[in-house]
């Protein structure tokens, strides 16, 4: 989740400075970090050098993570987190390769597990605050398969066909599928230029509204379960789309809910900042440093600032 991940950052030594800060830092002996014959290094000096935004972000994150752990530790299953890690290890070709990839991002296996646990706490928080019904999930999701004939964006492209040829081929495939829809998967495996889904008989899994090309989405959500579309043009090429029966809806429901919550937060960051504010109030959070409080309120808990940051920054770190 992009906006949440922007707040789940490694806490640097700058957070430790707050322990030495009162309402304002002065150059008194109590605020001296290092002394020498050449002069002292104070909390105020160091905070000025590091920057209050970074200190506020780090300290807020540390505090937030402690609160979330206290509130949701009994709801997060470590076994599921271990299963996530095992899945990632397989994707990277084994434990050693996975841990090497982590090291390249400055992470250890333990730190990565801690990050997954923190992300799980955030999911629990948002699940508490943002209610989504089963009917809403069904309304906003559709299980689908497709056959794609790619259109070349330029003549030198190795993949795809010219627009006219691609359309003609897609129309021929659509006629073949319409004669016997039960062969959709077999034909998708043979003809689709989307190699990822072609290996799975064209299966895309569940598609959410707002997740894909608008023309593709419009055509898909018009279909009844089991129906096959006419040829649909999108920014990728020409598709034949099949609406699959959601026989596994109950097992996929929680994952779909989390994705819909993420979409809602992306569209309306106030949902996230309000959830944080409620949490701070519940735990009687008191900012001892006025400057830190100002940064947290004006930037971190400001939905407009968070939205700008989410648009400019991407999700860093390894995929889950």
Curated annotation (Swiss-Prot):
Keywords: Cell membrane, Isomerase, Lipoprotein, Membrane, Palmitate, Rotamase, Signal. PANTHER family: FOLDASE PROTEIN PRSA, PEPTIDYLPROLYL ISOMERASE. Residues 139-245 form the PpiC domain. A lipid is attached at residue 21 (S-diacylglycerol cysteine). Its EC number is 5.2.1.8. Residues 1-20 form the signal peptide. This is Foldase protein PrsA. A lipid is attached at residue 21 (N-palmitoyl cysteine). One of its GO terms (molecular function) is peptidyl-prolyl cis-trans isomerase activity. One of its GO terms (biological process) is protein folding. It comes from Staphylococcus aureus (strain Mu50 / ATCC 700699). Plays a major role in protein secretion by helping the post-translocational extracellular folding of several secreted proteins. Transmembrane segments: none annotated. GO terms for cellular component: plasma membrane. The keyword Signal applies. InterPro entries: Foldase_PrsA (IPR023059), PPIase_dom_sf (IPR046357), PPIase_PpiC (IPR000297), PrsA_foldase (IPR050245), Trigger_fact/SurA_dom_sf (IPR027304). It is a lipid-anchor. Residues 159-198 are annotated as: Disordered. The keyword Nucleus does not apply. Belongs to the PrsA family.
């Amino acid at each position: 989740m992009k906006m949440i991940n922007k707040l789940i950052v490694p806490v640097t030594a700058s957070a430790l400075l707050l322990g030495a800060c009162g309402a304002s830092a002065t150059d008194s002996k109590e605020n001296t970090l290092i002394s020498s014959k050449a002069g002292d290094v104070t909390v105020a000096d160091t905070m000025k050098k590091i920057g209050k935004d970074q200190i506020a972000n780090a300290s807020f994150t540390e505090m937030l993570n402690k609160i979330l752990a206290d509130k949701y530790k009994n709801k997060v299953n470590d076994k599921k987190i271990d299963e996530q890690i095992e899945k990632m290890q397989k994707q990277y070709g084994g434990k050693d390769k996975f841990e090497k990839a982590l090291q390249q991002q400055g992470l250890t296996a333990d730190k990565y597990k801690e990050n997954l646990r923190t992300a799980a706490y955030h999911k629990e928080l948002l699940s508490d605050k943002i209610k989504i019904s089963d009917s809403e999930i069904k309304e906003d999701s559709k299980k689908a398969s497709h056959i794609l004939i790619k259109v070349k964006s330029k003549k030198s492209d190795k993949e795809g066909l010219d627009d006219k040829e691609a359309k003609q081929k897609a129309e021929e495939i659509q006629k073949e599928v319409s004669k016997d829809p039960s062969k959709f998967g077999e034909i998708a495996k043979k003809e689709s230029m989307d190699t990822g889904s072609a290996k799975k008989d064209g299966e895309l899994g569940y598609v959410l509204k707002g997740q894909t090309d608008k023309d593709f989405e419009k055509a898909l959500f018009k279909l009844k379960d089991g129906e096959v579309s006419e040829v649909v043009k999108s920014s990728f090429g020409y598709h034949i789309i099949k609406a699959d029966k959601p026989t596994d809806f109950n097992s996929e429901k929680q994952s779909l809910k989390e994705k819909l919550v993420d979409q809602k937060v992306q569209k309306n960051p106030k949902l996230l900042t309000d959830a944080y504010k409620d949490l701070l109030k519940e735990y009687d959070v008191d900012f001892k440093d006025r400057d830190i409080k100002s940064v947290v309120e004006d930037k971190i808990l400001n939905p407009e600032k968070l939205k700008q940051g989410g648009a400019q920054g991407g999700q860093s770190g390894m995929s889950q």
